[in-house]
Amino acid sequence: MKIKNILFKTSSVLWILWGLVHILAGVFTMTFVLSGDYSGAIAGIADAVDPSLVQMDYPAAAGAVIGQHGFNLFWIGIITFICAFFIWRGNKNAIFLAAITGGLADLGYFLFLDLGGFVNFVPGTIMTVISSAAIITSFYAHFHGNKKKKKA
């Protein structure tokens, strides 16, 4: 098997894992919000923060914002999960759609939650490492795997 195919398959597996984790996180977040447990949703997201520090009465608008975040986690996970099956075969559009969707989602996560010190390495930061690795492997395969050797 060519290295290009191995890289596409590696990227696909990484995006499947990343997508499933985000689908699940979205479902959990929306479930907390829909049950009125806004503190539980926040504690689930900012898992490095003592849950007692976020235990309070939040206005319904805050719950709506957190619920929207959960929905975003869910659909971003769905998109990257679906893209993974197309990346397996080297589909250029899927490579870029997953990179833009998952990559930008994790950039925001990194800037506001990781750098803020609000999350633990697992599962949060490791997911950023996984999406970065998925992007790098698929981009490398796409941009360098198609080069033909020049004849001397």
Language model features with spans:
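Topology signature of small-to-medium multi-pass alpha-helical membrane proteins
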Residues: 1-152
